[in-house]
């Protein structure tokens, strides 16, 4: 699995640019035996400054090509150079 980098800049497949603020854990669903299942990515839209939280695995997932056949980006979020 790809590593999501804190302070990394990522492009969402729909075009918005985000900065990862931190990686955290869901306290309500934390599993001590498998803590990776409760990881969350906290990220900020670089233009609007809105903050979002998404499960780590979802942030790191592939674009659904059946639902979005015209999207060429492979992953939901892909790291880019700072702009």
Segments the model singles out, each with a brief description of its role:
Residues 1-83:
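Mixed-charge, low-complexity intrinsically disordered regions
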């Amino acid at each position: 699995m790809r590593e999501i980098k804190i302070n990394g800049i990522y492009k969402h497949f729909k075009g918005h640019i985000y900065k990862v603020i931190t990686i955290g854990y869901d306290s309500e669903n934390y599993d001590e035996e498998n803590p990776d299942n409760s990881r969350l990515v906290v990220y900020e839209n670089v233009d609007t400054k809105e903050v979002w939280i998404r499960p780590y695995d979802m942030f790191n997932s592939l674009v659904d090509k059946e639902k979005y056949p015209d999207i060429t980006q492979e992953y939901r979020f892909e790291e880019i150079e700072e702009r």
